[in-house]
């Protein structure tokens, strides 16, 4: 899978390095082409299912799942500790921050979003990659009760790579702006409502909470499909990197040999071995009582912690 990913990345970067900058920006891989690119039947089936699920991930579809009507007014449903409402002072701070967010949008979208009114705000715990960071979800209503929009504010901090690129100086004064601008640079089509704002002394980027985003569950595909999938990932990553105008430099670094592919395969193998060692140490610590866990967590997860 690693070799497939790196080889696809190398080939696509080499191709795009010879293309005009504008063509690189327009070059895209839509669902139909992605389906054609996949050689494994099982992966093509998962792509089809992921696309179908993504088309249903919209604000209006989320309305009955995440809200309820109380005294004639829509409210976000609490699911403690994952979704909780805010104190009035924090609600006011988020609402004020959304006013500032409007100024980061293109004029057309500023008018569109400005036509919506805030109905409810809640704090929402998000994925593993954002553990320890704050995130809000905001329900807004437009011209009718069925005309709804969910926005998500996610805290943004300075990249862990920044010290190695910019030293102690910050290339962007606002880290939410950094996330938005880099996402727009890497993606052919980004969320048009991407923007940034500040709540208190914390910086955030803002996006649609439900914007037809989809993913392929890796535990649903076999080894052959995983290898195929890794090649698609490498292909797409190359497109994103090429849009930043660095394709020629990257292609030159790869050269004509497979030395980099071999090096990354060795690294991946070593990393996999280390992961198994780390996991074994983690399991030992849990079983010995040195690390606390939530009661019942292991029984419901099909975990390797079970004896």
Q: What does each model-found stretch correspond to?
A:
Residues 46-83:
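Acidic/Ser/Thr-rich, low-complexity mid-to-C-terminal regulatory regions of eukaryotic proteins
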């Amino acid at each position: 899978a690693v070799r497939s990913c790196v080889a696809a990345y190398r080939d696509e970067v080499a191709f795009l390095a010879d293309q005009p900058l504008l063509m690189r920006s327009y070059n895209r891989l839509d669902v139909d082409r992605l389906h054609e690119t996949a050689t494994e039947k099982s992966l093509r089936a998962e792509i089809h299912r992921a696309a179908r699920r993504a088309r249903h991930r919209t604000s209006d579809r989320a309305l009955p799942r995440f809200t309820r009507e109380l005294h004639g007014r829509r409210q976000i449903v609490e699911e403690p500790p994952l979704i909780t409402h805010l104190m009035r002072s924090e609600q006011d701070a988020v609402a004020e921050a959304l006013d500032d967010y409007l100024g980061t949008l293109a004029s057309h979208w500023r008018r569109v979003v400005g036509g919506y009114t805030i109905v409810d705000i809640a704090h929402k715990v998000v994925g593993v990659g954002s553990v320890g960071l704050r995130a809000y979800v905001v329900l807004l209503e437009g011209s009718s009760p069925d005309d709804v929009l969910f926005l998500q504010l996610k805290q943004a901090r300075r990249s862990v790579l920044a010290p190695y690129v910019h030293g102690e100086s910050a290339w962007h004064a606002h880290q939410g702006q950094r996330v938005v601008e880099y996402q727009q640079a890497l993606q052919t089509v980004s969320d048009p409502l991407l923007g940034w704002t500040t709540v208190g002394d914390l910086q955030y980027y803002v996006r649609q909470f439900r914007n037809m985003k989809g993913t392929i569950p890796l535990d649903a595909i076999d080894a052959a499909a995983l290898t195929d999938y890794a090649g698609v990932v490498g292909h797409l990553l190359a497109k994103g990197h090429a849009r930043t105008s660095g394709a020629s430099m990257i292609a030159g670094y790869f050269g004509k040999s497979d030395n980099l592919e071999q090096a990354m395969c060795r690294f991946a193998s070593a990393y996999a071995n280390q992961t198994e060692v780390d996991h074994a140490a983690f399991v030992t610590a849990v079983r010995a009582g040195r690390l606390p866990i939530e009661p019942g967590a292991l029984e419901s997860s099909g975990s390797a912690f079970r004896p």
